[in-house]
């Protein structure tokens, strides 16, 4: 599948347009005031002027593919700047969420961190004065023109952390990502099933797969974030992009609206009928993905960041699709850009930190990402994944989501500062049949309404 530079950059702009209306250890001081502007000190690209530096970097690039790319980029950076030593602390997404704030408020915070967008993480860090605005570095390195404006907006907050997608820039992202359905081509072919395009087509296949003795959907939610993805793509494919986008951004709607309750009912029905892994709350995401990779399930629902693992396990038999509502040619799914690479206010070497961020997100980095099976936020020129491959599927679905009216919705946990915990716990209770779909929706709405009232 061939895609020109213009097409790739158009996709990035389209992604932004879909999301612009919307709104996945050590490293200063323990008390920082919110910074309304970037540092008064002049910024520089001269990394050598810093002398010998140990740059502490916290990231969540632990998965195969993205970890390989990060290791290679760190190696290249240190070769280019031999006066800099990268001290990398890499943790899973869930571990990073629970430990990063403690690190940022320590006496020796990291220099560079990956901060999750939205109110729970980035908004909290900004309000606490823990992240440095990067607008000056964006001009110095050209991030303000390299990245589409709407992508940059996802990494912006007002200095008090109260308003997302406006104010100062607090990071740039390395990857693009969407959540979708990975499928086993061989299993579908053996059962005479076509690749589903809508949520109804997908659901219609599940009884046939189950009757064949095969598990339809491998699913593990011990980390809790997979539950957000499961509900997100189901809700999006039922409710549609506009309804979910306006809900997450607090513009209209309620989590107790009929489509959101229907999405919860759909997921609980899958659990009741044995369409997803039994006891999923005690099974890890990686174990579920491994079962899919061994050919023990027809589908697994997760993000494009897992494509290197699927390529390794299934090779040509692995496929990827994003589902859409009935009657729509555009899939609707959860996604956006990867976690922002941010500079902490406690960093003693912000110029070096900015040079590092530029190095791991620039055009050269995009090619390294692609070479290791990842989807970059801004793709390099003449990117052309081989037709019929999983990487081509991912590129095609990324394009479909970001063309026309757009079908990309933000991650649901961006909705409130506490929504990650509320939603992830509620999905576990939903699949364990400890909450009815209506009770599930009411729990989400209670959190959401309280946040809107507090603004």
Feature map (PLM): residue ranges:
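Extracytoplasmic/periplasmic solute-binding protein
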Residues: 160-174, 179, 203-253, 297
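Short, solvent-exposed loop/beta-turn-alpha elements that line the ligand-binding surface or hinge
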Residues: 135-150, 238-262, 312-313, 324-333, ...
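Extracytoplasmic/periplasmic substrate-recognition and gating elements
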Residues: 79, 191, 273, 312-376, ...
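C-terminal capping/gating helix-and-loop segments adjacent to ligand/active sites or protein-protein/ligand interfaces
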Residues: 246-249, 376-381, 395-449
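Conserved N-terminal structural module of periplasmic/extracytoplasmic solute-binding proteins
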Residues: 2-130, 195, 327-329, 368, ...
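Glycine-centered hinge/linker elements that transmit conformational signals in sensory
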Residues: 208, 249-281
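Short helix-initiation/N-cap motifs at beta->coil->alpha
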Residues: 90-99, 199-204, 279-293
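Hinge/lid segment of periplasmic solute-binding proteins
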Residues: 120-178, 319-321
